[in-house]
């Protein structure tokens, strides 16, 4: 009978299909299939956790790395700290200049840079070159403003001849913004754009004053100051009661303005 069964392919297929159907529909087969699915899911989860563990190693930062990051942050901040004068002592980046050794070569490069920059002004006029140099000198003088005005008082001089602030006024493309950028680089400070200056107590002039005293920054370089800032009752003129030199870059006219 078995031999007949093996010879008869049709009967063989019917029997096999019958038992195949029985097997795949049986609870045991279903459980086995579910087990395989669960096993695959577990394997996939294990693989995922393995990848996450490897990723976690990359994300985790050691205490040493954190200290390094904080140190870099402090150094970045120090680079933006400006020159300050307190009780007759000059500070740069929180250190007395007595503690700072400036290489002679660096001084030479700075002087050459200033000379070359002023020489570029010869394309306009001799007056333009003179005023450019005067603006640069004023920026250095402003760092010692307190000491200079105190000395002027001792010598019975008019302190209004040593202005607290200066105005660079000129025609478009006269080089005002470029000059401010150059001075900012010389002093290790940043130029402030007036349009982005936020108001303090409803006045940008108050913000200017806060930057001057709280940030201990001298000079404060502000670009694109509108005329109304000087006329308004809350403006710069009412905050800094002194005489400001008005530099007209690109023009031969130079005058003094009471603020």
UniProtKB/Swiss-Prot annotation:
Keywords carried by this UniProt record: Plasmid
InterPro entries: P-loop_NTPase
Superkingdom assignment: Bacteria
Record's protein name: Uncharacterized protein aq_aa27
